[in-house]
């Protein structure tokens, strides 16, 4: 049992996978459609039914012929559709075989080894490449040809429009001609209006006459149809009478044969009655014993049924418990798997945290070592610093002594100068030497001052360079720290990404497991629902069987009671058997005839039921075909609606163009166009009225012929009525010879009459008993049929509800699939976006890695990076300048204050102009005092004056 259940579950899962893969379509109702190509129309139920209706007089011959013609047309249409379906199926089979072959060849080509390169493969690659190039060239050529054709068509349209544009002289001539024609047309229109009024009055009178004649004609046609139906009915009466005569003769022969058989049976019955009397006593005893046994068996049966119902309930409870335990087991398995996976994840996280902890400990030790080394280096540098300070203090400071020494020397020099000036005896040569020495001394002093300034500047520059170097080293250290932090963050982010990817995979896996579990639960639920339905059906069937058995028991009891009565009656009949033999024979004959009539009626009703069933199947097939046609029509309507919308859009565009062109026309042309339209409309009305007049004139000769036929038919009808009246008078005439017919034989005496009345009363009592029995059987059968009808109606409602539910579920499934497809599309888009972002991240990582490697090597960054950075700076500067300029423009536009303090909204006048000379640059020059007039060229006297040469300023 478990193996079979697992197999069925696997099969159901495979079927569901196939259903999920396959697209959802509307389910066509399953109907066994027969092949109409091999059907004989004369043997169809529709033709037979029509013939029967015609024979019964319910359907006229003309209507029957019209219905037959319609049925043959429909049959031909069905045959053509079936042939087309067969052809399409053959084509589909052929095409599927071709597709399978092509797919097989493609698979062989795909499975061909890639590494195996031969000359044939190279040639094939070249051929494919050239074929692709050739196809691309063909497509380009087709597009170019299409564009060329469209441009040619546009050119032709433009040329036609240009030709249509009339010249002003021609327009005036046309206007004059059109005005003259409009005046003439107005006069004609006035005349036509008068004529139309007269014609309308005539037409109104003719229409009234025509309506009266049409009413009379309709009455005559209706009377004619009635007469035709009566004629057809009267024609079928002799045929029916002949058939009835044949049936009566056959029945007469059969009854004579049966009479002989019944006489023999009566003899045998007299012998068997004696035996039956002996058997009846034994049967009564057996009957009592059987009734007792039946009651005992019935009690046992009820007990067994109760036990069976209890066992069925226990079985259903066990199945439900099994299903719940299976679902709980599946849920526990899922929870166990998830817990194991969570355990594994926690273990991985713990190991990762331990690794990170160990790595942090190592880094901490390294940092401690580096700190120790840096402390030692700091102590050494502090010792060096103190030593250098001591050395600096030990160096003597000669700045003050040198300055004092220099001042003393200056004083001595000045004293010497004074002494030399006071000495008058010194010669000229000595004075020159003294001057030279003084000049040299001044030069040396100036050089000394310059050198001092240079020394001071150099000291400042060295200090600045040292500060810059320290700043750069600090920046370098900060950049290194940032880089290390970024690398750590990147690694942490990579780890987080991996963790999230793992979680995502686990979530997807859990979702799949939940989906599988949901599918299994849904399958089990469907199974239980089906089992419940089957159980309900079985219970209902058992109840129906129980009720049927009870009804049968009641019928058997009633039949037993009736048999007891019959036995009593038979005992009475046996006493009076000799006297009542002749009456019994007559009764038997009548009963046999009635039974035959009942059998014939039953056969006729069965035939009618079969015909109706066939007609129902045919109608259902027609409904299916009509539904298909309706669906095709709806599709065609939707397509035509889409095309109509497109055409309407194109028409709207064309209408817009036409409106633009019509606006360019003159008002006179519009009025003329309106007048022409009115004239055309009036002409159309006149033509329509003339057509109506012609139709009425054509109908008049047909009316005369119909009047003549009607008069002939009325004469015939009056003759028929006169003939019928004469026949009735002859039949009712009291003085006729055949009016009365005396019965032969002797009159009965009173005793004989009393005896005959007693016999008739006995016969009447028997007939009443039989009628009561038949009424009872009829009531029982009618009860059963009513129950069956109510059940069938209830089943119809159930089927309708089920169909509605199925349609609702199909709609839900369709909506769910559409939503799933949309979500899948969104997911694919998101996946593509994530892939692109991952690519960008990788590129950025590579870029950062290259930058870091260059920084570590001590190389400068790429020139492209520098250019991009400069571009960014330049863009920022440009953006700031543009914002400032815009703000200034807005302020100027708001203020617009003139030099004299007056505010104005007028635009400023130009203060400069660009010269037209080719040699000079196009730089703006001021107008001068007489703006906006350009300054005049210098005169002839100004040409010979030289402009002063401005000397450069020496600093």
Curated annotation (Swiss-Prot):
User: Where does the record locate the signal sequence feature?
Assistant: none
Keywords (A to Z) from UniProt: Cell projection, Cilium, Coiled coil, Cytoplasm, Cytoskeleton, Differentiation, Disease variant, Flagellum, Spermatogenesis
Q: Where in the cell is it found?
A: Cytoplasm, Cytoskeleton, Microtubule organizing center, Centrosome, Centriole; Cytoplasm, Cytoskeleton, Flagellum axoneme; Cytoplasm, Cytoskeleton, Cilium basal body; Midbody
Q: What is known about the tissue distribution of this protein?
A: Widely expressed.
The molecular function GO annotations come to:
protein-containing complex binding
Keyword Translocase annotated: no
What domain of life does the native source organism fall in?
Eukaryota
Q: Which proteins does it associate with, and in what oligomeric form?
A: Interacts with CCDC38 and CCDC42. Interacts with intraflagellar transport proteins IFT20 and IFT88. (Microbial infection) Interacts with Chlamydia trachomatis incM/YT288. In host cells infected with C.trachomatis incM, CCDC146 is recruited to the periphery of the pathogen-containing vacuole but recruitment is not dependent on incM.
Mind telling me what this protein is named? Coiled-coil domain-containing protein 146
Q: Which organism is it from?
A: Homo sapiens (Human)
Q: Which gene encodes it?
A: CCDC146
């Amino acid at each position: 049992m478990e193996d079979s259940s697992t197999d069925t579950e696997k099969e159901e899962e495979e079927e569901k996978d196939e259903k999920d893969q396959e697209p959802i379509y509307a389910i066509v109702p399953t109907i066994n459609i027969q092949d109409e190509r091999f059907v004989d129309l004369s043997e169809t139920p529709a033709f037979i039914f029509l013939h029967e209706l015609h024979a019964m007089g319910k359907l006229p011959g003309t209507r029957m012929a019209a219905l037959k013609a319609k049925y043959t047309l429909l049959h031909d249409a069905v045959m053509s559709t079936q042939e087309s379906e067969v052809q399409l199926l053959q084509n589909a089979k052929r095409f599927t075989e071709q597709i399978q072959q092509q797919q097989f060849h493609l698979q062989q080509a795909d499975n061909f080894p890639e590494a195996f390169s031969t000359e044939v493969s190279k040639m094939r690659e070249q051929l494919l490449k050239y074929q692709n190039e050739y196809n691309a060239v063909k497509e380009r050529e087709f597009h170019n040809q299409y564009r060329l054709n469209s441009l040619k068509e546009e050119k032709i349209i433009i040329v036609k429009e240009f030709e249509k544009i009339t010249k002003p002289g021609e327009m005036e001539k046309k206007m004059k001609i059109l005005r003259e024609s409009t005046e003439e047309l107005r006069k004609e229109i006035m005349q036509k209006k008068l004529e139309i009024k007269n014609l309308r009055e005539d037409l109104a009178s003719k229409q009234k006459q025509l309506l009266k004649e049409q009413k009379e004609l309709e009455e005559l046609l209706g009377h004619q149809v009635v007469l035709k139906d009566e004629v057809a009915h009267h024609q079928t009466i002799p045929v029916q009478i002949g058939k009835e005569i044949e049936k009566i003769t056959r029945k007469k022969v059969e009854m004579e044969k049966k009479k002989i058989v019944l006489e023999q049976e009566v003899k045998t019955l007299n012998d068997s009655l004696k035996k039956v009397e002996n058997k009846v006593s034994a049967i009564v005893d057996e009957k009592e014993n059987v009734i007792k046994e039946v009651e005992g068996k019935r009690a046992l049966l009820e007990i067994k049924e109760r036990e069976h119902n209890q066992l069925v309930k226990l079985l259903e409870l066990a199945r439900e418990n099994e299903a719940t335990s299976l679902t709980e087991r599946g849920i526990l398995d899922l929870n166990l798997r998830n817990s194991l996976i969570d355990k594994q994840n926690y273990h991985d996280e713990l190991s990762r945290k331990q690794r990170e902890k160990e790595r942090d400990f190592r880094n901490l030790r390294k940092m401690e070592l580096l700190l120790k080394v840096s402390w030692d280096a700091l102590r050494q540098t502090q010792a060096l610093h103190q030593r250098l300070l001591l050395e600096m203090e030990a160096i003597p400071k000669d700045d003050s002594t040198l300055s004092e020494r220099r001042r003393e020397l200056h004083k001595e020099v000045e004293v010497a100068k004074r002494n030399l000036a006071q000495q008058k005896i010194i010669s000229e040569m000595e004075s020159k030497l003294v001057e030279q020495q003084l000049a040299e001394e001044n030069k040396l002093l100036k050089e000394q001052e310059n050198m001092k300034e240079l020394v001071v500047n150099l000291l400042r520059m060295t200090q600045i360079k040292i500060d810059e170097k320290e700043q750069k080293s600090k920046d370098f250290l900060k950049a290194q720290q940032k880089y290390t932090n970024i690398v750590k963050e990147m690694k942490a982010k990579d780890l987080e990404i991996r963790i999230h990817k793992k979680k995502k995979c686990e979530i997807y896996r859990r979702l799949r497991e939940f989906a599988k579990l949901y599918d299994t639960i849904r399958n089990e639920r469907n199974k239980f629902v089906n089992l419940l339905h089957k159980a309900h059906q079985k219970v209902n069937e058992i109840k129906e069987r129980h009720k049927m058995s009870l009804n049968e028991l009641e019928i058997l009891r009633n039949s037993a009671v009736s048999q007891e009565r019959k036995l009593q009656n038979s005992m009475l009949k046996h006493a009076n058997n000799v006297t009542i033999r002749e009456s019994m024979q007559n009764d038997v004959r009548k009963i046999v005839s009635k039974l035959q009539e009942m059998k014939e009626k039953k056969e006729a009703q069965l035939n009618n039921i079969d015909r109706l069933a066939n007609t129902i199947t045919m109608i259902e097939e027609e409904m299916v075909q009509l539904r298909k046609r309706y669906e095709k029509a709806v599709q065609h309507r939707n397509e035509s609606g889409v095309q109509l919308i497109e055409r309407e859009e194109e028409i709207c565009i064309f209408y817009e163009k036409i409106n633009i062109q019509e606006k360019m026309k003159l008002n006179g042309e519009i009025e003329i166009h309106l007048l022409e339209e009115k004239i055309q409309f009036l002409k159309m009305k006149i033509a329509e009225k003339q057509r109506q007049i012609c139709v009425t004139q054509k109908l008049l000769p047909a009316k005369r012929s119909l009047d003549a036929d009607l008069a002939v038919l009325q004469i015939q009808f009056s003759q028929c009525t006169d003939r019928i009246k004469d026949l009735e008078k002859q039949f009712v005439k009291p003085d006729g010879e055949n009016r009365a017919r005396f019965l032969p034989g002797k009159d009965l005496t009173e005793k004989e009459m009393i005896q005959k009345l007693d016999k008739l009363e006995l016969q009447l009592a028997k007939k009443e008993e039989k009628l009561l029995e038949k009424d009872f059987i009829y009531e029982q059968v009618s009860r059963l049929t009513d129950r069956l009808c109510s059940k069938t109606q209830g089943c119809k409602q159930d089927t309708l509800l089920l169909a509605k539910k199925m349609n609702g579920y199909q709609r839900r499934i369709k909506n769910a699939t559409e939503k799933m497809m949309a979500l899948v599309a969104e997911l694919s888009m998101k996946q593509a976006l994530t892939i692109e972002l991952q690519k960008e991240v990788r590129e950025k990582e590579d870029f950062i890695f290259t930058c870091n490697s260059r920084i570590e090597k001590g190389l400068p960054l790429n020139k492209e990076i520098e250019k991009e950075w400069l571009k960014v700076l330049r863009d920022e500067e440009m953006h700031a300048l543009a914002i400032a300029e815009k703000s200034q423009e807005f302020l100027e536009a708001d203020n617009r204050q003139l030099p004299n303090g007056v505010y104005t909204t007028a635009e400023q006048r130009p203060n400069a102009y660009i010269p037209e000379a080719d040699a000079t640059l196009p730089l703006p020059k001021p107008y001068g005092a007489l703006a906006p007039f350009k300054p005049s060229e210098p005169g002839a006297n100004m040409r010979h004056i030289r402009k002063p040469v401005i000397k450069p300023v020496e600093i």
